[in-house]
């Protein structure tokens, strides 16, 4: 009778093992199904992220292309503006000189003019020209009696004199300054000490 009694625990043990196996299989299948379900969710989520990233990349690329084109357009406009500034830089100055030319033409058109009227006309024309020069900051360099300045004067000759050496004794041709830049130096004679 002991054998049947021993068989019962063996059978119970087998049943218990079978239940454990079934539970493991069931939980394994459940885990596998959960993993598959998660993969199914993860894959569409990654695909969505990829699509969004591709859209953003395309938008950034388009924005970059537009910015590049705009930069190129700005560069071309700047080059055109600079070229026009160089080309037409003296436009206003030239317009002001037209009045001087008109005065000279009017003086030449007078048939029976006297020397006095010609002189008066030339004097008025010179005043017009001086006004244009003043307006555009063109100033005369007339250094008579001043110390020689090689930045503004060009010595044409030296003359022995009693006045201090390196003094301008004669202005042969006036010079001109535009703002602070010498556009033509004054042509001058400069004193030197008398030789003994």
From Swiss-Prot:
CDD domains: GrpE. It is found in: Cytoplasm. Disulfide bonds: none annotated. Participates actively in the response to hyperosmotic and heat shock by preventing the aggregation of stress-denatured proteins, in association with DnaK and GrpE. It is the nucleotide exchange factor for DnaK and may function as a thermosensor. Unfolded proteins bind initially to DnaJ; upon interaction with the DnaJ-bound protein, DnaK hydrolyzes its bound ATP, resulting in the formation of a stable complex. GrpE releases ADP from DnaK; ATP binding to DnaK triggers the release of the substrate protein, thus completing the reaction cycle. PROSITE patterns: GRPE. The keyword Metal-binding does not apply. Residues 1-26 have a biased composition (Basic and acidic residues). One of its GO terms (biological process) is protein folding. Keywords: Chaperone, Cytoplasm, Stress response. Homodimer. GO terms for cellular component: cytosol. This is Protein GrpE. Residues 1-40 are annotated as: Disordered. The gene is grpE. InterPro entries: GrpE, GrpE_coiled_coil, GrpE_head. Belongs to the GrpE family. GO terms for molecular function: adenyl-nucleotide exchange factor activity; protein homodimerization activity; protein-folding chaperone binding; unfolded protein binding. Its main location: cytoplasm. Transmembrane segments: none annotated.
């Amino acid at each position: 009778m002991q054998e049947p009694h021993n068989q019962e625990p063996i059978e119970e043990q087998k049943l218990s093992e079978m239940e454990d196996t079934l539970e493991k299989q069931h939980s394994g299948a459940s885990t596998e199904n959960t993993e598959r379900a998660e993969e199914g969710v993860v894959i569409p989520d990654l695909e969505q992220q990829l699509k969004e990233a591709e859209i953003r990349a395309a938008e950034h690329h388009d924005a970059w292309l537009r910015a590049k084109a705009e930069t190129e357009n700005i560069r071309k406009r700047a080059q055109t503006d600079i070229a026009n500034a160089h080309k037409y830089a003296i436009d206003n100055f030239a317009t002001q000189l037209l009045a001087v030319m008109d005065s000279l033409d009017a003086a030449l058109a007078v048939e029976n003019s006297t020397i006095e009227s010609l002189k008066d006309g030339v004097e008025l024309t010179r005043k017009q020209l001086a006004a244009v020069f003043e307006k555009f900051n063109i100033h005369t360099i007339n250094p008579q009696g001043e110390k020689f300045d090689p930045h503004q004067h060009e010595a044409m000759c030296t003359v022995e004199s009693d006045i201090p050496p390196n003094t301008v004794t004669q202005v042969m041709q006036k010079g001109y300054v535009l703002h602070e830049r010498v556009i033509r130096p004054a042509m001058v004679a400069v004193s030197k000490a008398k030789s003994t």
